[in-house]
Amino acid sequence: MTSQARIPLWIVAVVAGLGVITVVGLFFYGSYVGLGSSL
């Protein structure tokens, strides 16, 4: 690993984590709203 990495690994990890949290959050929010409207 060179010290002049074009993209730091922690930035990749943070972006990936935020993406997963966003997708999971939208999924649960959508299912919650769907169940609420169907009742």
UniProtKB/Swiss-Prot annotation:
UniProt membrane topology term: Single-pass membrane protein
Subcellular location field: Cellular thylakoid membrane
Example of a GO cellular component annotation carried by this entry: photosystem II reaction center
SUPFAM superfamilies cross-referenced by the UniProt entry: Photosystem II reaction center protein J, PsbJ
Keywords carried by this UniProt record: Membrane, Photosynthesis, Photosystem II, Reaction center, Thylakoid, Transmembrane, Transmembrane helix
Key word Transmembrane present: yes
Top-level division of the source organism's lineage: Bacteria
UniProt similarity note: Belongs to the PsbJ family.
Protein name: Photosystem II reaction center protein J
Organism whose genome encodes this protein: Synechococcus sp. (strain JA-2-3B'a(2-13)) (Cyanobacteria bacterium Yellowstone B-Prime)
Gene coding for it: psbJ
